[in-house]
Regions:
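Short Lys/Arg-rich basic patches
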Residues: 1-20, 27
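Non-catalytic surface loops within mature trypsin-like serine protease
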Residues: 15-17, 144, 178-182
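Short, basic amphipathic alpha-helical segments that act as recognition/interaction helices
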Residues: 22, 33-59
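N-terminal leader/targeting helix
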Residues: 48-90
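C-terminal edge-of-domain segments
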Residues: 167-184
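An N-terminal amphipathic alpha-helical segment
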Residues: 73-77, 82-139
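Short, hydrophobic/π-rich interface segment
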Residues: 117-172
Length: 184
């Protein structure tokens, strides 16, 4: 029986009692539909977050960048101690730094419109929010930073565009005014 390009292979793993109880609890509570989907999800996260490069515990790398698990409350403290008139500029610098990381890690140009879905998938995997493009608009659902000025600057620095903010509460909508250099 073929699945994809290869055929399925049965694998047996032996779990400690505590591990099996944890998995059974997840399934019982409806958090996971079964063992196979759970393992598939774990492998997807392992690959996409490059966990094989982590120096566990406490030192995590995803490509060329060190990443941390940080409470949104701590990010909000940082944000709200930056003068509001600097938010767009700070966001732009964050976007430029993310552009370097994404281009080096994924091997794609973040300013290439055809690669934006890959860029947005990476941001979603890392917890930035859910990003959508429709015509000349970019929308962010569930952003981890609640200030559209920062996001406008971030996307401008990352994608090489100029944006107008259309909504000031999440989900954020930005209109693409001008693409600076979005060619492959």
């Amino acid at each position: 029986m073929g699945i994809g390009k290869g055929s399925a292979k049965r694998t047996t793993i032996i779990l400690d009692e505590e591990e099996r109880e944890f998995i059974d609890k997840l399934i019982r509570e409806g958090k996971e539909p079964g063992i196979k989907p759970l393992i598939s999800k774990m492998l997807d996260i392992y690959r996409s977050m490059m966990i094989y490069d982590w120096r566990f515990p406490g030192e995590y790398y995803c490509g060329i960048s060190r990443i941390v698990f940080l409470n949104v409350e701590l990010v909000n403290i940082l944000v709200h101690n930056i003068p509001k008139e600097k938010w767009r500029e700070v966001g732009r610098k964050m976007g430029e730094a993310s552009k370097v990381y994404i281009e080096a890690t994924l091997g794609i140009r973040a300013t290439d419109l055809e690669k934006w879905l890959e860029v947005f998938k990476r941001l979603r995997v890392q917890g930035f929010g859910d990003f959508y493009v429709k015509d000349k608009y970019i929308m962010i659902k569930a952003p981890f930073i609640g200030e559209p000025e920062i996001w406008a600057g971030f996307l401008e620095g990352l994608l090489g565009v100029e944006l107008d903010i259309k909504t000031f509460t999440a989900p954020f909508v930005f209109e693409i005014k001008q693409a600076k250099h979005n060619v492959g």
